[in-house]
């Protein structure tokens, strides 16, 4: 009886220890966003809340960003192993030695847009010559502006860039301290509300520049040494985006719960516009998150021609689709 009791106690102790211990070691990932959290980031917060990253062995920390250019630089430097950035920025900076690799595309369409006041007399990109464009210093739009300028027949240096905080864009535009600003389409509704009928707008994709937008990028060295971790991250992220397309409300709720200053209705509108940016024939027919070879080759040539590359490279080294589940596709 005594032996049986001891064995029972030992078994109970072992079971308790196993229950208290993690199933496997968690890989800490500091994932830098392209910007401050918003509706476009809802899937990451939802997957984290649901424990999907944790179940995949990832201890995820979501770090607010300060622009795509900054995100690329930090990932390339290894300060963050994984991040989110505009793909055209990643291609441009790769030519300067920034070793990052795209592994999951979010914006199949360029999210970039230009905003101005109609009352200013501006009607198109060409009218921006000699004008002031305000946005944050690290904003990705500045990096790829030369391509848009050349595509519209104006000198890229004919505009003056004014450093302003992202939250000051509308106020600066209304005060006419700047003539135009840049912003992503997923907050288009905010500009419409604030500027009303005086809002002037052109989407870059409709002005000759539809490069791939926000894409999950990975530090090249980290990818080589941690393929299983990257594969797990992409698998969860792809699953999360598909889940949010199917049912956005709980995803946006998870975002708002983690970022108390955000308002649910506003971020839900944000997400609805994100869905538009995610949708193209490749995300619908090949896989959600895919980077098409021909489009990537075209984006590379555009960057090379209009912006310039310090060091040319094989564009296929800048991205991979190997971690995607091709059974998961964009449904809208």
Residue ranges, per PLM feature:
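Cleavable N-terminal signal peptides
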Residues: 12-13, 23
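Conserved C-terminal helix/tail region of periplasmic/extracytoplasmic solute-binding proteins
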Residues: 296-332
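Secondary-structure end/capping motifs
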Residues: 225-308
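Short, glycine-/small- and polar/acidic-enriched structural segments
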Residues: 26-175, 179-186, 202, 210
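Bacterial N-terminal signal peptides that target proteins for export
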Residues: 1-11
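Sec/Tat signal peptide C-region and signal peptidase I cleavage site
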Residues: 19-25
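A bilobed periplasmic-binding-protein/Venus flytrap-type ligand-binding module shared by bacterial periplasmic
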Residues: 112-122, 212-229, 284
